[in-house]
Amino acid sequence: MTWGSLPVIAQQALKAVDAPTLVWIRFLVASLVLFVLLGLTGKLPRPSEFSKQTLFLLVLGIIGISANFVLVAMGLHYISPTTTQVLWQLSPFTMILVGVGVFKEAFTHWQKIGLMLLLTGLVMFFNDKFGELFSLGSYAVGVMMAASGSMIWVCYGVAQKLLSKHFNSQQILLMIYFCSSFVFLPFAEPSQIAHIGNPFLWGCFIYCCLNTLIGYGSFGEALNHWDASKVSIVTTLIPVFTMIFSTIGHHLAPDYFAASDMNIVSYVGAMVVVAGALLAVAGEKVMGLFLRKI
């Protein structure tokens, strides 16, 4: 739910600060809080625990999460929060393709069906936007940013899972957040934060900072206790939450949150995309449970 609400709120925070500054402060706040918590409990990562493999995985995770954060944030200047989260469903498919191409995993029939549904759903979702996409204007730029951010996030997802054999989830996040904050420091303008005068925008800004800590902390813990497929089932529902939060936001504060520009075909397309992602990551489990019940 925190990931589902994030683009809705971040789009407002980006009216006060630019994307690199927002991404930098999110990483900085999260790393400082985690440093204090792990320091108090004596669970800070030790230098002796590092190896060439873990350092490589850390760099991979830093690249994945840093690029994802900034590309999606920049994309929100051009497209709606719901669009970013529908495109987020490219992540599980990219993860599957990495597994097939790199780790020689099988490409199951459920994954093939899921891929077909994803492509069909995306065509339906963008049914009234093809003119804007093919004109390669600002809307197309936003779509390409969000799509690229979703696919490169897989670098973080793979790194997080492999690093969990050596560190706990909070240690991994601390190292990735801390290093990522330095990546964005040269591009950030901290003075923008001091000039946020609107209390509503301040609230959105603070929420974005806390969201990083809560959302990725929960994701990391979930990977420690669940199979990756179970975690993926939950993440496929993110666009649904985003659509709900966008609708609620517009009804409560129409001056801040814009009305949805989606038609009925787009809504159906979004659901088809979610269904495709769900089948791809857990088709056999979901259908097996369904067949047992009937």
For every predicted segment, state its role.
Residues 1-32, 80-83, 152-179, 228-230, ...:
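Juxtamembrane helix-loop-helix junctions in multi-pass membrane proteins
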Residues 2-9, 39-88, 123-124, 208-226:
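Specific transmembrane alpha-helical segments of multi-pass solute transporters/efflux pumps
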Residues 16-67, 94, 98, 151-155, ...:
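Transmembrane alpha-helices of multi-pass small-molecule transport proteins
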Residues 27, 127-128, 201, 236-294:
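C-terminal-most transmembrane helix of multi-pass membrane proteins
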Residues 48, 88, 104-124, 139, ...:
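Loop-to-transmembrane alpha-helix entry segments
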Residues 16-24, 49-55, 127-150, 189-206, ...:
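Juxtamembrane helix-entry segments on the extracytoplasmic side of multipass membrane proteins
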Residues 25, 65, 69, 83-90, ...:
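Helix-helix packing/entry segments at the starts of transmembrane helices
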Residues 8, 34, 95-97, 101, ...:
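Transmembrane alpha-helical segments that form core, pore/gating elements
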